Amino acid sequence: DNLGRLTRLNKSLLLLSKIENEQFQEEAEVDFKQLLHQSLSDFEAIAAHKNSALILLEETEMSYRMNRDLAVILVNNFIKNALVHGTPGAPIHLRLKQHALSITNQGTPTPLKVDDIFARFKKSGTNEKSTGLGLPIAQAIAVKYQLQLTYSYTEGHRFTLTFPI
């Protein structure tokens, strides 16, 4: 549905513009353990529909000062991305350590092009509903809060968000 895609594209571009223009000023300590549990609960039905399991392998108390809405968008983008691009039936593993959050999923059996994954409108798959802006939005949030967002591939696709100490 082209109208739905255009609407999502418009909302994503507006969000990206707001992030880059510092329009999310309100900040507070965000409890990432609580946020992660809420996000996992929110995506549980979608994961079940894809016969996938969202598995929290490790969790530690971790909080960071940032805009709560952007923190929710950041975590949800990673989970949604893993569900959309992951192999149906394969588990998605999440780890929350003292200064890092990582999410690993099975998808294409080859690494993604590191130069392209955070670029706007670059899509690695054939999902026509995708706007190609989820990871660029995550990257913009990471840059705003001095977080390091990295991608690696070793028996699965792993995105890691590292928080400053």
Give residue spans per PLM region:
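Short beta-strand/loop element within the Bergerat-fold HATPase_c
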Residues: G89-A100
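Short conserved segment of the HATPase_c
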Residues: T110-F121
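Short helix-loop "hinge" at the ATP-lid/N-box region of the Bergerat-fold HATPase_c
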Residues: N81-L83
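Short alpha-helical segment of the dimerization/phosphotransfer core of two-component systems
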Residues: D1-L6
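Conserved catalytic submotifs in the C-terminal HATPase_c
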Residues: A28, A53-S63
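Glycine-rich ATP-binding loops of the HATPase_c
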Residues: Q146-Y153
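Conserved micro-motifs of the catalytic ATP-binding
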Residues: N21-E26, S63-D69
